[in-house]
């Protein structure tokens, strides 16, 4: 077994090319040959850890596949910052919407046709920007609570640690299923994902 490598999904499916390709049905032999070469190249790069950076670039996909059992849709219109902060969330029409304030959440619910007249229950959630990207957890070995906390806490600036500690001290009785939104850098911007 090759272990957990980029582009190999938990069901064994191998993604070796972009989604937007056009195949010439008049060349089936060439398509199969090229497919096999690309699959072997993908596996070789993964085994030799040459394409581990792809875990970071496609972090959200691996995160989603690993946590599909929770099936929570999160919609966000807020622009992530470099500071730990409390933001707002509400569950509307089976989706969780996050933003900086309640009015922005209502606007998002209307704009995305989730609800015309939402009357949600608003709650705080914590936004945490990481300094360096994490690699996703293996499909069969999702992080436990203490491991996840350690990965986050060890990967934020000193100022953000202080801010996070202030928030946690103030809200020390946060319920079990509170939402934490994490951002982490990648070459084309950031990845944004949530943890309940």
Residue ranges and their predicted role:
Residues 1-196:
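N-terminal ligand-binding/catalytic initiation module
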């Amino acid at each position: 077994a090759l272990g957990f490598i980029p582009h190999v999904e938990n069901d064994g499916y191998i993604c070796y090319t972009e989604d937007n390709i056009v195949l010439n049905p008049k060349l089936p032999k060439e398509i199969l040959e090229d497919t096999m070469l690309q699959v072997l190249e993908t596996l070789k790069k993964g085994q030799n850890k040459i394409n581990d950076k792809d875990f970071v670039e496609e972090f959200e996909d691996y995160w989603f596949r690993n946590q599909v059992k929770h099936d929570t849709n999160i919609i966000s219109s807020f622009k992530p910052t470099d500071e730990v902060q409390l933001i707002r969330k509400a569950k509307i029409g089976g989706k969780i919407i996050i933003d900086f304030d309640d009015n922005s959440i209502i606007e998002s619910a209307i704009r995305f046709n989730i609800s015309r007249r939402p009357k949600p229950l608003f709650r705080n959630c914590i936004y945490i920007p990481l300094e360096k990207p994490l690699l996703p957890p293996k499909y069969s070995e999702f992080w436990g609570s203490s491991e996840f906390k350690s990965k986050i806490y060890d990967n934020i600036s000193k100022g953000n640690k202080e801010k996070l500690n202030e928030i946690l001290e103030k809200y020390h009785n946060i319920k079990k299923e509170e939402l934490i939104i994490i951002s982490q850098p990648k070459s084309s911007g950031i990845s944004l994902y949530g943890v309940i």
